[in-house]
Amino acid sequence: MCIRDRANAFKAACGPAGANIVYDIVGGQYSEPALRSIAWEGRFLVVGFPAGIAKMPLNLTLLKSCDIAGVFWGAFTAREPVKFRQQVEELFDLMKAGKIDPLVSETFPLEKGGDAIAKLESRQAVGKLVVTMD
């Protein structure tokens, strides 16, 4: 699928106004079409790039009047532990209130925790993997 076709598919999924926030955890050939589908004054978050480091025409940011921001989660947790703790607490509150429902794709008993790690390392995990201690 070419960039324009992929961008049109993203736009169709987001609606005519486009996406207010793009959370790009893939990168590579998917980043430019995602940026093309962003709404006016949207926000594009660069989180990861397992598909490769994207090369995008930056004039799209001007045409969309949008922002691109890098999100380095590991550094954030180390540099701003108080904010990190507050955000985790807020996420758990939202989950408890039923406002968000994280995708748990698989649950492992503690003795199979290594299998969960192997699945993460091989990028086979979809959603969250949970290791239980019962």
Feature roles, as predicted:
Residues M1-Y30, E80-Q86:
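Adenosine-nucleotide cofactor-binding segment
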Residues E32, E111-G114:
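A broad detector of short, well-ordered amphipathic alpha-helices
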Residues R4-R6, T107-E111:
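Short acidic-hydrophobic, aromatic-tinged amphipathic segments that line or gate anion-handling sites
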Residues P16, N20, F92, A97-E106, ...:
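C-terminal capping/lid region of NAD(P)-dependent oxidoreductase domains
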Residues A7, K11, L35-R36, N59, ...:
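Solvent-exposed, non-membrane alpha-helical residues enriched in polar/charged side chains
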Residues Q29-I100, A125, T132-D134:
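Glycine-rich phosphate-binding loop and adjacent beta-alpha segment
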